[in-house]
């Protein structure tokens, strides 16, 4: 400060950098003149951190240096135009209240340099004329000091990074292995691993059944369809003798042959008296080829018993080698291979059953199961009785009960 009472700048930045063994703070009350505001480009740049409020280029009258003003310093200052920033403050003086010297390490395009960090200041209204100054970081002594500081910084960084003990290194390796194992378990849980097939192999029967697409396939061996010559002659002679007699018969049930052959069946319905033959007899039904011989459908029951229960023996014609599919259809349609006719001798050879215990020639039973006598001939009712029957009204319950009794008797007769 001069004798006229005006504020005067004195050089102190270079001496602070070169004289400080440890980068200490300058004395309180030092003056700096603002050369450029934060928006004015300069030869170098100070670090830009979140706490940075403004970056200025300041001078002590001899050397210039970068000055970083923190955000907290701007907020706590009494500067009235702080909302407008440092634009237009060139030539004004900064009164430093809290300041420190820092080193900027070279990174990206920013060179290494010394700079000042201002934590508290006061902007004076006094303006100083512009004077040509040199950059403090361009001085040779300052460059030498900067290199020494950078070497010390690098050595401290290397020693701090190389200070891991063996136990710390093992802990790092263990944590890395645990992390890797967790990643492997997570990857396995996300994958669907398919191991070797342990299922039992399919049999030929299951394989052929799956290839049949759900259709039932039946196979009959050719040996089962062959009839020995002796049996063939007996059956042929029996059939020819029965045909000569002109006897027509139809069995209600046919037992399965021991050979298990699958042949066409010829069935006919028989009536009890010749008078009802033409009206109640149904045409013969031809059965289709199947693995097992099926029993013909029992004829419907009339008011009087009309079914003939016969013991029959099959009459078979000689079988030739198995025809083709279209030939087998024509054979079934043209000539049946098996006819059921009455044979008393054949009935004696087969095991006796309840149906075969009846006589070969059907005779009307004399008594009911309850030992009451059958009555086949009835007198003509009188006219008065006929009129009474017509005028009688039966209740629905009684009609249903009678119908149930009739149906039960018909089912029992059919089963026999």
From Swiss-Prot:
Comp. bias intervals (Low complexity): 259-272
Record field: compositional bias (Polar residues): 234-251, 273-292
Main location: nucleus
Gene Ontology CC: chromosome, telomeric region; nuclear body; nuclear telomere cap complex; nucleoplasm; shelterin complex; telomerase holoenzyme complex
Modified residues (Phosphoserine): 25, 313, 317
Superkingdom in the source lineage: Eukaryota
Placement of sequence motif PWI: 11-13
Pfam families membership: TPP1
Cellular compartment(s): Nucleus; Chromosome, Telomere
GO biological process: embryonic limb morphogenesis; establishment of protein localization to telomere; intracellular protein transport; negative regulation of telomere maintenance via telomerase; positive regulation of telomere maintenance; protection from non-homologous end joining at telomere; regulation of establishment of protein localization to telomere; segmentation
Single GO molecular function: telomerase inhibitor activity
Interaction with POT1: annotated span: 156-245
UniProtKB keywords: Chromosome, DNA-binding, Isopeptide bond, Nucleus, Phosphoprotein, Telomere, Ubl conjugation
Cross-link type Glycyl lysine isopeptide (Lys-Gly) (interchain with G-Cter in SUMO2), residue numbers: 345
Tissues/organs with expression: Ubiquitous.
Chain intervals for the UniProt region annotation (Disordered): 234-306
InterPro entries named among the record's database cross-references: ACD (IPR028631), TPP1/Est3 (IPR019437)
Further remarks about this protein from its record: Adrenocortical dysplasia mouse was initially reported as a model of human congenital adrenal hypoplasia (AHC).
Disease annotated for this entry: Defects in Acd are the cause of adrenocortical dysplasia (ACD). ACD is a spontaneous autosomal recessive mouse mutant resulting from spontaneous splicing mutation of acd. ACD mice are characterized by developmental defects in organs derived from the urogenital ridge, reduced survival, poor growth, skin hyperpigmentation and adrenal insufficiency. Forty percent of the mutants died within 24 hours. Analysis of 14.5 dpc to 17.5 dpc embryos revealed reduced formation of caudal structure as well as limb defects.
Assembly and binders: Component of the shelterin complex (telosome) composed of TERF1, TERF2, TINF2, TERF2IP ACD and POT1. Forms heterodimers with POT1. Identified in a complex with POT1 and single-stranded telomeric DNA. Interacts with STN1 and TINF2.
Job description of the protein: Component of the shelterin complex (telosome) that is involved in the regulation of telomere length and protection. Shelterin associates with arrays of double-stranded TTAGGG repeats added by telomerase and protects chromosome ends. Without its protective activity, telomeres are no longer hidden from the DNA damage surveillance and chromosome ends are inappropriately processed by DNA repair pathways. Promotes binding of POT1 to single-stranded telomeric DNA. Modulates the inhibitory effects of POT1 on telomere elongation.
Protein name listed in UniProt: Adrenocortical dysplasia protein
Lineage: Eukaryota, Metazoa, Chordata, Craniata, Vertebrata
